[in-house]
Design a protein with these regions (language model features):
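Extracellular loop-to-transmembrane helix junctions
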Residues: 2-19, 76-107, 116, 176-182, ...
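Hydrophobic alpha-helical segments and their helix-loop junctions in multi-pass secondary transporters
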Residues: 195, 209-233, 241-243, 263-291, ...
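Membrane-interface helix-loop-helix modules in multi-pass membrane proteins
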Residues: 49-110, 121-125, 142, 147-158, ...
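Extracellular/periplasmic helix-exit of transmembrane alpha-helices
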Residues: 273-291, 346-381, 416
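Membrane-interface "cap" regions at the ends of multi-pass membrane proteins
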Residues: 16-70, 259, 301, 305
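Flexible loop linkers connecting adjacent transmembrane helices
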Residues: 23-49, 72-75, 85, 89, ...
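Loop-to-transmembrane helix boundary motifs in multi-pass membrane proteins
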Residues: 125-140, 343-350, 393-398, 427-465
Length: 576
């Protein structure tokens, strides 16, 4: 395939989908810009705080992107570029965009509360508690994984005698110091924009220049060399503070400025791909079973592996937690929901297509196992194309910028996940129609923002230090189960309020089938592992039990959801 043509056609389809299907959704759902959003009606200067659309887009996009739209498409490339492209385009427009837009819209019509509260309203209190328990535990796993990724990106390398290997650690130390300076700059940005009313445009220009300055300083001055455990503790302290700090101080400005790293990364990628316009060796279709297994472990059958592996970039349950958790509390106007949620999803799809071009350009290195880490594949492929156009001298600079950008989004995602977990932890104890202010005794104490955050951070960091990777294989299915349940929740709510919800039927049931099939395969693999015995048998039991519990949870919530849809239909018929 020609990478430039592949990218241009894919992006054109996404633009058409945004204009026509996204516009149709907004019309059918009744987006009303005259209605005040929770950011205004419940403004508290902490969690509820209206943000200008570009700023909120920066937060939302930085939070949902992370490394997902890079890792997933590159790993799924073993099935060929045609299946990946079709799932990214169809999934993004008709699954992920609908899911993200719907979750945000439902939340702003529920006082900015999470998708769990929406489930409580339209399905029932039992369903709410089940969903929030599942979502909270999934977020703990996300915190553990992303904190670990950040710590690994920052950590020093040591020689055999225990001394710091400064040459080998320089790149990580640079990333760490750049990230620290970036956080400090974001705080200053937030102060001047929100407390000194500095013009956003001028402040943005200064902020982008500041990013470049931070990178130049960090690449030449990196005095901090710490091990993995110390960095995990530091990251834990950071996300703990960040998740309880008013959003205007850090979350909004940092995510907004971080988004320019991502936009810059995507611009570099497009310039490299279009300028180089390579014909790559990546096959269109390799078959319905992964026989390449470049990482050493086969993904198995294309169904369900393709639809679980490519989550961010097609449809991801984590997005519904972000949209209904932090984004809905900052949405200035209802009309902003479409570009931020639906548009943000499709931009992520474009990033997924760029990732396919990157792996395609170095396909032989990937297929033979020479270069298999998705982030390295992404940076190597794009930097190689860029340097082919502008000369080999720019390879190292572009490569470092791409690695830094991916690291920045992992840090963004981990503190957003911590804040979301804090919200959901408190919502679990609040009864329908009540607020946290109505709680008394130990429930009021444990749902205090600082206490809830402390519990979340300790659990996440502890899991990150003790081996989250042992259960990480379940995250793909768990994340897509979140997506199926998010689609179910919004579908039930739209039915309850008398709006068109038929666009949710197929995506909802398809994702449920994908999830259950994936979980059945996982459970089967754990049973085989248990029968074989050996050192890893304990973790086989753990993964198997978690898989069975997820299947039971999915079936229970879907049954309750179908009953709710039936009740809504009867109520609508009675009203007629």
């Amino acid at each position: 395939m020609n990478a430039a043509l592949f990218l241009i056609i894919g992006c054109a389809v996404l633009v058409v989908g945004y204009i026509f299907y996204g516009g149709w959704l907004a019309k059918k759902w009744g987006v009303d810009n005259s209605r005040p959003t929770p950011a205004h009606t419940m403004e508290d200067g902490k969690d509820y705080c209206p943000a200008k659309a570009p700023v909120l887009m920066g937060h939302h996009f930085s939070s949902i992107a992370g490394a997902g739209p890079i890792n997933g498409p590159i790993q799924a490339a073993v099935f060929g570029w045609v299946p990946v492209m079709l799932w990214v385009l169809i999934g993004g427009i008709f699954f992920g965009g609908v899911h993200d837009f719907g979750a945000l819209f439902a939340s702003i019509r529920h006082k900015g509360e999470s998708i769990g509260e929406v489930i409580g309203d339209v399905i029932g209190a039992k369903a709410k508690k089940l969903f929030i328990t599942f979502a909270y535990l999934t977020l703990i796993l996300v915190v553990a994984a992303f904190a670990s990724i950040v710590a690994n990106t920052f950590k020093a390398t040591y020689t055999a005698d225990g001394a710091v290997d400064y040459a080998a650690s320089a790149a990580n130390a640079s990333t760490a110091i750049i990230s620290i300076m970036f956080i400090l700059m974001a705080i200053l940005f937030g102060f001047f924009v929100y407390r000194r009313n500095a013009p956003l445009g001028i402040s943005t220009i200064i902020g982008v220049i500041g990013i470049v300055v931070c990178m130049i300083i960090g690449l030449n001055w990196h005095p901090i060399y710490l091990n993995y455990t110390v960095w995990m503790i530091i990251v834990g302290l950071y996300i703990g503070v960040a998740s309880v700090t008013p959003v205007w101080i850090l979350l909004q400005p940092r995510d907004y400025l971080s988004s320019f790293l991502l936009y810059g990364m995507m611009i570099l990628a497009v310039v490299g791909i279009v300028g180089c316009s390579p014909t790559v060796d990546m096959p269109a279709f390799t078959g319905f079973y992964d026989t390449l297994a470049p990482s050493g472990t086969s993904l198995g059958y294309m169904f369900p592996a393709l639809f679980v592996t490519i989550a961010c970039g097609a449809v991801s349950g984590f997005h519904s937690l972000v949209g209904s958790g932090t984004t809905s509390k900052q949405l200035d106007q209802e009309k902003d929901a479409k570009p931020i949620a639906y548009g943000g999803m499709l931009i992520e799809c474009a990033l997924a297509l760029i990732s396919v071009c990157a792996v395609g350009y170095i396909w032989n290195q990937y297929a033979d196992g020479t270069t298999t880490t998705p982030t390295v594949v992404f940076a190597t492929g794009l930097a190689s194309m860029f340097s082919k156009v502008f000369g080999s001298g720019c390879y190292n600079v572009v490569y470092s910028m791409l690695i830094l950008a991916v690291s920045a989004f992992c840090l963004t995602s981990v503190d957003t996940a911590t804040r979301l977990a804090r919200y959901m932890f408190a919502e679990f104890f609040v009864e329908p129609g009540k607020t946290r202010e109505d709680l008394t005794g130990w429930k009021r104490v444990i749902t205090n923002p600082y206490v809830a955050t402390g519990i979340t951070v300790v659990a996440g960091v502890a899991l990150g230090l003790t081996g989250y990777a042992k259960i990480w294989d379940l995250f793909g299915a768990a994340n897509q189960l979140l997506a199926a349940l998010g689609l179910l929740a919004v579908c039930c709510w739209l039915g309850k309020v008398g709006r068109n919800n038929k666009m949710f039927y197929f995506p909802m049931f398809f994702m449920l089938i994908v999830t259950l099939t994936s979980l059945v395969f996982t459970i089967k693999a754990q049973v085989v592992g248990i029968m074989a015995g050996g050192e890893g048998v304990v973790w086989c039991y753990v993964r198997g039990i978690i898989g069975v519990l997820l299947v039971i949870l999915a079936i229970d919530l879907v049954v309750e959801g179908i009953r709710a849809l039936g009740r809504n239909k009867k109520a609508a018929q009675a009203a007629e």
